[in-house]
Structures are given as structure tokens and as C-alpha cells.
């Protein structure tokens, strides 16, 4: 028992961090600083990939959050260099390929095997298994190729514009739709990627998965359903945003619709989505408890 306690991972203070970890941190900074500098001043500055910085900083916080839990769960370290080195080398090769050929999916995606390899080399499989969700979380940071984004966003934009047009028409607003172009009164609105793209879906999916992992839901049914229902929740939130923008433009003009209120509608989107996630989780919690009580009641009857 004493041996187990001695080998338990403890969250180190700044004055006890070994120089090896400082060297690793400096190496990662030298390796990936140019990559993320380019992302912050390039791709992540566009509306299509605006979710990137949010997911990136949430990922950093989540790694910190999980590392702080290691002593609490008594996770022991068992370094596995034979398993970690091949994964680390693979990650470095992916980084070299991505950086040299300007393939962001490899350049940014290489961070996952690099961090996993370092974890296995110095901490082992137990810590790596404990951090599996944190590594999975990093997948949302990797920029997808443009053809994948275009193929995924076109049906979403069409569906959002279709729903918006029918809802506002039912409310007696003079609205017409041509593809993803909405005409309301004398104004035309283009349902762009930012209004119904993968950026909002990815961000909401990340927040939903983070919410599930932090709250430690034990019901597999509840976790699965909440993860799946985030997609229609994102759709409803996007429709709400486009409706708000259309009404602002119709009543206060194009300048209001494309100015500050356009950015404010993005806040409305996430508030709506988070409220729907919480409401959905409450319903799932109610039904999961109801289903869990049924077998226990039957077992009591059988004992009688």
C-alpha cells in the first residue's frame, strides 16, 4: 500500500518541476509556436474557423483539469518507452510532412500523437488511459480540409434557410428563399458559413462533451443521447440566430443587421444552445432515472 502511494502521481508545484519537463515544454513551444502563430493570424481569423481558438484554449484547460485529478484517483505511473517512442516519432514525421507541404490537418493533427507519445514515455499507459478524453478533445482543434467543410456546410445552410423562411412566412413576414439567399422585404440576406457552419456545431459539440465529462454522468444512455442531440440543438440555435438577424434587418435596416447586432446574434446563438443543452440534459436525467428505477422495482417484487 505504501509503495502504491509513493508512486501516485502528484500535481507538482512550480518549484518541484523536473528540468526534463521544462525541456519538453520548451521543445513543444519551439516546435508548435510557429504553427499556432500562423493559425491565430490566418485561418482562425476567418469566420469559417472562428471556433478554433475557443476549442484550443478549452483543450489546454481540460488537460490541466485532468492532470489535477491524477492524485485524487491514485493513478500510478508506469513508463512505457517502447510504446511511446514509435508514437512520438510518428507524430514528428506527420509534423514535418504537414509543415513542409502546408497540410494543416497533418501539421496540427501531429500534436495528438506527439503529446500521447510523451505521456507514454514518461508516465505510462495508466495516465494515457486516464487522459484519453483530453486527447480525443484535441481532434476538434485540427482544421478540416476545405472540401470537407464545404460538403458539410451546404446542406446545413440550405436547411437553416429553409426553416427560417417557413417560420417567418408563417408569422406573416414578406420573405422568399432562393437556395441559401433570403429576401425579406427589400433586403437580401445570405446564409453564410458563420450563420450555419461547422464552427458553431464544433464549438457546441465540444462544450457538450466537456459538460458530460466534467459532470461525470454514469448513465451511458444519457451520455450517448446528449452527444447525439447536440447536432439538432446546434441546428435550432442557428435557425434562431438567422431569424433574429432577419428580423433586425427587416425592422432596423441592413446597417443594423450587419453591424454590432450581427455579432450580438452570435451571443444569442450560444446562449440559446447552452439553454437547450441544459434543458435536454435535465430531461435525459429524468428519463434515465425513471428507467433505472424500473428494474429495481421488478427485482423487489421478485424477492417478495
UniProtKB/Swiss-Prot annotation:
Coiled coil: none annotated. GO terms for biological process: proteolysis. One of its GO terms (molecular function) is peptidase activity. The active site is at 195 (acyl-thioester intermediate), 241 (proton donor). It is found in: Cell membrane. Its EC number is 3.4.22.-. InterPro entries: EpsH-like, Exo/Archaeosortase_dom, Exosortase, Exosortase-2. GO terms for cellular component: plasma membrane. The chain crosses the membrane at residues 17-37, 50-70, 78-98, 103-123, 130-150, 189-209, 228-248, 259-279. The keyword Signal does not apply. Disruption phenotype: Disruption of the gene does not significantly alter exopolysaccharide (EPS) production. The keyword Membrane applies. Keywords: Cell membrane, Hydrolase, Membrane, Protease, Transmembrane, Transmembrane helix. It is a multi-pass membrane protein. It comes from the Bacteria. Disulfide bonds: none annotated. It holds the Pfam family Exosortase_EpsH. Belongs to the exosortase/archaeosortase family. Exosortase EpsH subfamily. Transpeptidase that recognizes and modifies its substrate by proteolytic cleavage of a sorting signal. Following cleavage, a covalent intermediate is formed via a thioester bond between the exosortase and its substrate, which is then transferred and covalently attached to the cell membrane. This sortase may recognize a tripartite structure consisting of a conserved Pro-Glu-Pro (PEP) motif, followed by a transmembrane alpha helix domain and a cluster of basic residues, usually at the C-terminus of target proteins. This is Probable exosortase EpsH. The gene is epsH.
